[in-house]
């Protein structure tokens, strides 16, 4: 492992960002490469299919900040499909898989907006979701339910595609969508799908959540399923050790209830870790990095600590 770390540092040091790394009250000046790239290199991953295309969506969530002021949070997600399996996940992860490596700071939006990685029909007849919520990574399982769509008369042109409208109620929210039969794929963003064409836009009836097709790429890309990650963490003596980080498995309904309890609490927007131990007390270290906008991001074993939370707006109510 020591030789592997030396090779990684020498090959990737040109991409490093330097930051003070705190370990049990002490400060060390280290290259971020030592730990931010370990997810990609040491994750236990399976290729469960090869997608022939990737659909990119812009997701917007209308909410309020800690002062109660209205804000709209945006992020992008990628959707792949192969042999009945669909993966919907943050665009940054898709981009990292194509380019190699990993930047924890790029995962901040997914953590702030509580957008997980969703495998539809994997395993067969089930939906598997992987999501970070400090201090753990969670994996949930639920039945794959048929979405009963009602086709309506609306027509529009979205991202250059002729589209028709439809509506359904799913997990407590009513969704109004447009889809195009020009792309004969029965998929869409997040957990939505089952129409006779690609979903190009989806908005809940309250106007809080909106997914809009942003791009469509015909390309062969592997659909990756991550079982667990092995993280490199400091031992407090200036050296590193490896730590296997498993997902905490829960029923989807139990995790949804837990998120409502934790994220729906009024204290969350003022103190986003109120419900968990202080990271320095519990883990003895905090990783620091910067996202592309220059904002500092803190994490523990790759799990992002949200520093600027907004009011939680669930994508499903039950």
Give the predicted meaning of each segment.
Residues 153-158, 162-219:
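Glycine- and acidic-residue-rich phosphate-binding/metal-coordinating active-site segment common to enzymes
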Residues 14, 21, 88-89, 194-197:
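Glycine-centered flexibility motif
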Residues 1-50:
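Bacterial Sec-dependent N-terminal signal peptides
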Residues 2-3, 147, 173, 188, ...:
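Short, low-complexity intrinsically disordered segments
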Residues 6, 17, 57, 166-168:
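Short beta-strand element of the conserved SAM-dependent methyltransferase core
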């Amino acid at each position: 492992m020591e030789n592997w770390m030396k090779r990684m540092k020498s090959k990737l040091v040109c991409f490093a960002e330097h930051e003070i790394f705190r370990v049990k009250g002490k400060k060390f000046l280290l290259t971020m490469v030592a730990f931010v790239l370990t997810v990609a290199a040491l994750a236990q991953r399976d290729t469960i299919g090869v997608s022939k295309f990737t659909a990119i969506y812009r997701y917007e969530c209308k909410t309020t900040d800690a002062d109660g002021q209205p804000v709209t949070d945006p992020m992008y997600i990628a959707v792949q499909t192969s042999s009945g399996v669909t993966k919907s996940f943050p665009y940054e992860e898709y981009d990292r898989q194509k380019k190699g490596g990993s930047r924890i700071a790029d995962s901040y939006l997914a953590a702030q907006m509580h957008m997980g990685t969703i495998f539809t029909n994997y395993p067969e007849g089930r939906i598997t979701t992987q999501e970070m919520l400090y201090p753990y990574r969670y994996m949930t399982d639920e039945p794959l339910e048929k979405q009963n769509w009602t086709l309506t008369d609306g027509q529009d042109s979205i991202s250059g595609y002729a589209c028709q409208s439809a509506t359904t109620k799913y997990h407590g929210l009513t969704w109004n969508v447009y889809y195009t039969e020009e792309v004969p794929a029965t998929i869409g963003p997040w957990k939505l799908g089952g129409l006779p064409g690609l979903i190009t836009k989806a908005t809940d009836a309250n106007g809080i959540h909106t997914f809009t097709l942003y791009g469509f790429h015909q390309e062969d890309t592997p659909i990756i399923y991550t079982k667990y990650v092995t993280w490199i963490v400091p031992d407090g003596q200036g050296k590193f050790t490896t730590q296997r980080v498993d997902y905490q498995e829960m029923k989807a309904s139990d995790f949804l209830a837990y998120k409502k309890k934790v994220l729906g609490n009024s204290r969350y927007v003022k103190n986003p870790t109120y419900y968990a131990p202080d990271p320095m007390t519990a883990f003895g270290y905090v990783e620091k990095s910067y996202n592309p906008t220059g904002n500092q991001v803190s994490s523990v074993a790759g799990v992002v600590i949200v520093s600027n939370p907004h009011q939680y707006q669930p994508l499903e109510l039950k």
